[in-house]
Design a protein with these regions (language model features):
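Carbohydrate-active catalytic/glycan-binding domains of CAZyme proteins
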Residues: 1-110
């Protein structure tokens, strides 16, 4: 959304969401395959101040495993954009920040 006066706004536009590659990720057999297995949280974007026309986003990718034997996990991905509208994922969707091993002090969601 864009506004010059903070009173009149442009129409809403989705600029980032789970896509076909996210939804095609393999999940354990115990999961209900009729629902998406990923959600994105903390999708705040920022303009990188030391380069012209560079925006960064670090959304948390929350993976739903659905059954107790498969813990829900969350990784942070890195996205870049030149205009704040069209986003590219860095590292072929590999986590930019990954959770620690099970049982470690960094294994929790937050």
């Amino acid at each position: 959304m864009v506004s010059a006066d903070f009173k009149n706004w442009s129409a809403l536009e989705i600029v980032f969401e789970a896509d076909a590659a996210d939804l095609a990720m393999p999940v354990p057999l115990a999961v209900d395959s009729s629902t998406p297995n990923i959600d994105f949280y903390t999708r705040c974007a920022m303009k990188y101040p030391w380069a012209e026309d560079v925006y960064l986003m670090m959304p948390s990718a929350y993976y739903h495993w659905g059954a107790d034997e498969y813990p829900a996990t969350m990784d942070v991905q890195l996205l870049t954009s030149r205009d704040g509208i069209c986003w590219r994922r860095a590292g072929e969707r590999a986590p930019f920040l990954r959770q620690g091993s099970d049982g470690s002090s960094t294994s929790g969601m937050y």
